[in-house]
Amino acid sequence: MTFTKKNVSVSQGPDPRTSIQTERANSKFDPVTMNYFLEGSKERSELMKSLAQQIERDPILFTDGSYYDLTKDQQRELTVLKINRLSRYREGDSVDTFNKRLSIMGVVDPQVATRIGVNLGLFLSCISGNGTAEQFKYWAIDKGTHNIQGLYGCFGMTELGHGSNVAGVETTATFDKETDEFVINTPHIGATKWWIGGAAHSATHCSVYARLVVDGKDYGVKTFVVPLRDSNHDLMPGVTVGDIGAKMGRDGIDNGWIQFSNVRIPRFFMLQKFCKVSAEGEVVLPPLEQLSYSALLGGRVMMVLDSYRMLARVSTIALRYAIGRRQFKGDNVDQNDPNALETQLIDYPLHQKRLFPYLAAAYVVSTGALKVEHTIQSTLATLDAAVENNDTTAIFKSIDDMKSLFIDSGSLKATTTWLAAEAIDQCRQACGGHGYSSYNGFAKAFNDWVVQCTWEGDNNVLSLSVGKPIIKQIIGIEDNGKTVRGSTAFLNQVKDFTGSNASKVVLNNTSDLNDINKVIKSIEVAIIRLAHEAAISVRKESLDFAGAELVQISKLKAHHYLLTEFVKRVGEFEHKELVPFLNTIGRLYSATVVLDKFAGVFLTFNVASPQAITDLASTQIPKLCAEVRPNVVAYTDSFQQSDMVINSAIGKYDGDVYENYFDLVKQLNPPKNTKAPYTAALEGMLNRPSLEARERYEKSDETAAILSK
């Protein structure tokens, strides 16, 4: 008889714990130092771990396996309790520190992060992006919103009949000169505000996107702050709200619908950084309307960071399980030897090819996420200063930067959230039947995650909006000799890779595949040639005829950005002993996530030779997987995500997958009362009398003999 951690066995059982301990002991680099790379610096790494520790030790914010058994109502209540608790941290945190705290909560309990983010992110960003400095000070600071106090905002853009086409929303804001008020109306069911996070129960105010109507003239969609509830939390007159009910995930968010019936607000509740309406009804339109949508960019950038953390989490779970799980004895082992161990899942080449790309993606996405986060902060700060000082030159410079940021943030949001969604399900499948258990984290992760592919820009629509300006830039260069600046400046080389140069191959052999800078160049050429071909159709028809190509261009642009920033960050990283391990990860990403997935594009447009693509599949990817394999545990440990953050029975640090999983199942489902509340129905089914007895034997031969006389 043997004794394991908590359970008694009559013979030696599986020992996954020893497997992961052995792997960890044989790792060739320090995960703590590697985390400095992933988080951008030692200081940020230590801050993130400190914030995670606070969450883990907080009795309200702490999350464990019981989280997966909560009902919708329980999730709603617990979410509010957590927001209440986080509001206390917000009072002592800087904005930057609290955003980092929310970034961790986005993995631990995403519905909490979202429900707060609607208020502090979307609502206040809308006011900051569209309101004057005085308006922002009033709504954010004076009213206490920035501290989650006083009032709670929601973001009223989406309608039942309009989502992606924001310019088409139909809620109206009609100016009444006599009272100096706007009258907010929902003219029909299609204009009902829909999917509004916080509207059902929480929000006191809403930043409403509505059509400005003055003297019967429609001036397009502007933004207005509209009170929904009074200080007693009762609905304001003319405001009707409802809960939209059960969703695929994130049930802790009180998404609702809103209808306005002649709701009057003061004229100065209209956000007036760009568009102004005087008391006499004079409308001063913004010279650059697109600036008013800057509020959406912050959310998109945060989703890139969310994608990194989700990729890190699910790849860690699947890889730790793959180390502990053994299945089938190898061909070189005596199948009849009872002492011969089965093969670890992690050692199957197919399993490596399935999972290692997502591990690599987490590393590469982390650098891009940090870069675009820094870029949006600096760009918006420069823009705000330019507008405040009425500096026309600086405004137009900021506009160029904003256009580039729109392309980068849009392509990154769409591509990385798609990638994370794919990773969650592939990692789940790689864990077999156990991956289907809610207690192992994938089910709720997927259901909570996939909305990221839809909100704040549906990924396909967003990808189209990224691809369109790139096509227009190509046409401008080719037809009008224009020069492009910013992150798409490489498009200026279009003549070098089209026309008589259309057959110029960038990736010829394995050596080229190993050179990340050449891979980056190949992505540029692929975008140029794809955009050049799409532009031919666009000139004849319209951009809509190039939809599939536009989405491909957007994805390639995202990978170009991510790999470029990864290479820069590796070159700047002070811990040179880690560079070889990072280079391996970067090459694996470029080989699997980029070249393998887009092999058709690279072959079709002569960017890579057929031999290079053949070598990629037969030699390069298996070789890179073999290089990553000895340090898989160190690579995952480098994410520095605790067991509380991971929240998966099979993904814990100690690797004891069976003990941990079995213990959690017994803890949350005590095997004491084995009869269910519906046992009577089961017993009635199993113990029911025979059909003849239930028919009182009225159709029996005996009855027939009696009745036939």
Swiss-Prot record:
Pfam families: ACOX, ACOX_C_alpha1, Acyl-CoA_dh_M, Acyl-CoA_ox_N. Belongs to the acyl-CoA oxidase family. Gene3D superfamilies: Acyl-CoA dehydrogenase/oxidase, N-terminal domain, Butyryl-CoA Dehydrogenase, subunit A, domain 2, Butyryl-CoA Dehydrogenase, subunit A, domain 3. This is Acyl-coenzyme A oxidase 4. InterPro entries: ACOX_C_alpha1, Acyl-CoA_ox_N, Acyl-CoA_Oxase/DH_mid-dom, Acyl-CoA_Oxase/DH_mid-dom_sf, Acyl-CoA_oxidase, Acyl-CoA_oxidase_C, AcylCo_DH-like_C, AcylCoA_DH/ox_N_sf. Keywords: FAD, Fatty acid metabolism, Flavoprotein, Lipid metabolism, Oxidoreductase, Peroxisome. GO terms for cellular component: peroxisome. It catalyses: a 2,3-saturated acyl-CoA + O2 = a (2E)-enoyl-CoA + H2O2. It is found in: Peroxisome. GO terms for biological process: fatty acid beta-oxidation using acyl-CoA oxidase; lipid homeostasis.
